[in-house]
Design a protein with these regions (language model features):
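Residue-identity detector for glycine
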Residues: 3, 14-15, 21-24
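C-terminal/domain-edge helix-coil "capping" segments
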Residues: 60-94, 113-114, 174-194, 199-274
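Sec-dependent bacterial lipoprotein signal peptides
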Residues: 34-59
């Protein structure tokens, strides 16, 4: 237990150099900012830390944060248009070694289910749902991609502030985050008011991993199964402020199936002020 505690704090302060997906990581300080996987690694670093937190006994299911000016609001801008950013989803197979393999077929299944459920939930709340592909072709695609990458980095910072507030003391007692005014590029042509960003990572134990989970204790080896982690944020496109944020951590739920994907979205959208 103490060893895991030390690993958690070392990882928070030093960062990861390489990630192998959910369940596998090389805990070494990240120095090469030019490495092609560096930005990806930084954005997913905290997701790996959440697994460590779970192992430390943190019973986390969802963690909702709302900006002060909307706290307590049950319906914020009802009927407003929301740009649904394509869900950033990756599903992995967890090997006996603890390494993971990205599964494109599983990922596509999950993305389809999650996208459909998100659209239905937003529509049920009276929101007009837009996607980037439906926006004007005159929009700068490269600029929009930069906004998506900026959000990934911001989400990572929010998670760090929530899980280790001593690292960002100015954010300890207030939820005040922004993507900046550049995010307004997502508003045209219909002047959408909000954007919803969703990031999900999930892993599933392979047959070999399941066997190790059963036989491992007899050999003095501990092995865990997969972990589902999701992050969702609602951003005000008029000023770039993050007005709602939710973190989901679960040990169960197969996103490859429509019904369990529906349950995951219900949890992920908990407290959404729309």
């Amino acid at each position: 237990m103490a060893g895991l505690h030390a690993t958690l704090h070392q990882a928070l302060r030093g960062g990861y150099l390489r990630l192998t997906g959910i369940g596998g990581a090389d805990l070494a300080p990240a120095h090469d900012s030019t490495h092609p996987c560096t930005m990806y690694s930084r954005c997913l670093r905290t997701l790996i830390l959440l697994i460590l937190l779970y192992l430390l006994g943190a019973c986390v299911s969802t963690r909702v944060r709302v900006a002060e000016h909307v706290a307590g609001s049950r319906s914020l801008g009802a009927g407003s248009s929301v740009v649904l950013i394509e869900p950033d989803v990756e599903l992995y197979s967890l090997m006996p070694s603890g390494l993971t393999e990205l599964r494109a077929d599983w990922t596509e299944q999950a993305r389809t289910h999650l996208d459909r459920e998100l659209r239905q939930r937003l529509a049920a709340r009276g929101a007009g749902v837009l996607t980037l592909s439906e926006l004007s072709e005159a929009e700068d695609r490269a600029a929009r991609r930069q906004i998506e990458l900026l959000y990934q980095a911001l989400a990572n910072s929010i998670l760090n502030a929530e899980l280790a507030p001593e690292l960002l003391p100015t954010k300890r007692d207030r939820f005040d985050w922004t993507l900046g005014p550049g995010v307004s590029a997502l508003r045209a042509p219909d002047q959408a008011r909000y954007a919803l960003f969703v990031l999900v990572r999930d892993s599933y134990a392979s047959a070999g991993r399941k066997a190790l989970m059963v036989l491992g204790p007899l050999l003095g080896v501990g092995a865990s199964g997969g972990t589902q982690i999701g992050v969702a944020s609602l951003v005000d496109l008029r000023n770039g402020k993050v007005i709602w944020f939710n973190l989901l951590v679960a040990q169960r739920g197969d996103l490859r199936e429509a019904e369990t994907a529906r349950v995951a979205i219900d949890s992920l959208l908990q407290g959404l002020p729309l």
